[in-house]
Amino acid sequence: MQVSVETTQGLERRLTITVPAENVENEVKKRLQQLSKTQRIDGFRAGKVPASVINKRFGPAVRQEVAGEVMQRNFYEAIVSEKINPAGAPTFAPKALEAGKDLEFSATFEVYPEVEVQGLDKITVEKPAVTVTDEDLANMLETLRKQHADWAEVDTAAGENDRVTVDFVGTIDGEVFEGGKAEDFPLELGQGRMIPGFEDNIVGKKAGEEAIADVTFPDDYHAENLKGKAAQFTITVKKVEAQELPELSEEFATKFGVTEGGVDALKVEVKKNMTRELDQAVKANVKDQAIKGLLANNEIEVPKALVDQEVDALRQQAAQRFGGDAQNMPELPAELFHEQAVTRVKTGLLLGEVIKANEIKVDDAKVEALIATVASAYEDPTEVVEYYKANDQLMQQMRNVAMEEQAVEAILAKATVTDVETAFDDIMNPQQGA
């Protein structure tokens, strides 16, 4: 076998491989002989079909099949001998498939980039210094009360946080537009569900009264034909309802599985959950900063094959999030996921090099701690831990997470990390402060 390697562009490589004719011919001959023993052809007894007839009928297909296998086998032998690490599957192109001649073919593929992580000491991370305060706990209990509130119809004017039932008709230049009309539409005021300006004149109206809302659809509105358009909505208020919040009581506590200790026990349980979620959010925030710093200080080229694989994975995840099956849904454009896919591939390659450079081995204690953290959110943590340990796939996922966390810790050890006083809501609900 003769092998030559050339760099075509970027990470793309082309191997040109020549396989001696006898390697191909011997295998073709062997398979044709096997076929002659099993094929039934009119005019010949079973097992007595002449080689020339078998060759004429099956020779080209057998040669194609053998050539494919020979190319695969010799390609992998070549990359081992040449110490090449391909990223993705190769594309084979045989020069010719002529009997009695050497098989010459090319294999085009991408390789992994050579990565040398640098600039870790230039990374700066602001670690949120935050705890769950009494005010945070009170706000969370209020949120839980609102989530379990009842609604009672009232004769008063609609106010912020009230719920109204309305009919509305929207027009643009005096014409009703598609999707601009609804009847018996429930709307909780103050939640920001509608476009800016829609709710403003509903506040202060009673059932039976009418409001006019002059609005402009945002430039990034989902309906292409409405982006940036000025519209007017005529809104009829049909019903106004006010929230009736449940009292913080022993009965209320039982809604959350707290059967003993009443409100005090509920507060302890809620604060424990808030603290666990806060710890996870802080860790995610710090990790995100570390990864962004890693990417900013290390520009690397990524194999298109890996990006394409990541795009497919993201596309499938998107289909699952929308409750669909990726097989049966219209294919979402690759452009939607390309930027995220590139970032994920770069991150994976760089973290892999951090792991390699620091000779990081998976920490079993960290794996145990990760499983325990997941399990603590469930009613029976012991059962969840046992479930994980009995599932090889889940355990491997946890080992991967642990390795990634260890890599991030290695980055943070060289980065400049500063504690910054932060409010609970700024970490848990960052979009509200945006």
Swiss-Prot record:
Subcellular location: Cytoplasm
Reactions performed catalytically: [protein]-peptidylproline (omega=180) = [protein]-peptidylproline (omega=0)
Protein's GO biological process: 'de novo' cotranslational protein folding; cell division; chaperone-mediated protein folding; protein transport; protein unfolding
This protein's UniProt keywords: Cell cycle, Cell division, Chaperone, Cytoplasm, Isomerase, Rotamase
Pfam family, one: Trigger_N
InterPro entries (alphabetical): PPIase_dom_sf (IPR046357), PPIase_FKBP_dom (IPR001179), Trig_fac (IPR005215), Trigger_fac_C (IPR008880), Trigger_fac_C_sf (IPR037041), Trigger_fac_ribosome-bd_bac (IPR008881), Trigger_fac_ribosome-bd_sf (IPR036611), Trigger_fact/SurA_dom_sf (IPR027304)
Residue ranges constituting the PPIase FKBP-type domain according to the UniProt record: 161-246
UniProt GO cellular component terms: cytoplasm
Enzyme class: isomerase
TM region(s), chain numbering: none
EC number from the UniProt entry: 5.2.1.8
GO MF entries: peptidyl-prolyl cis-trans isomerase activity; protein folding chaperone; ribosome binding
Alphabetical list of SUPFAM superfamilies matching this protein: FKBP-like (SSF54534), Triger factor/SurA peptide-binding domain-like (SSF109998), Trigger factor ribosome-binding domain (SSF102735)
Gene3D superfamilies hit by this protein: 3.10.50.40, Trigger factor ribosome-binding domain, Trigger factor, C-terminal domain
Main location: cytoplasm
Domain notes for this protein: Consists of 3 domains; the N-terminus binds the ribosome, the middle domain has PPIase activity, while the C-terminus has intrinsic chaperone activity on its own.
Function: Involved in protein export. Acts as a chaperone by maintaining the newly synthesized protein in an open conformation. Functions as a peptidyl-prolyl cis-trans isomerase.
Protein family (similarity comment): Belongs to the FKBP-type PPIase family. Tig subfamily.
Descriptive protein name: Trigger factor
Organism name: Pseudoalteromonas translucida (strain TAC 125)
Lineage: Bacteria, Pseudomonadati, Pseudomonadota, Gammaproteobacteria, Alteromonadales
Gene (UniProt): tig
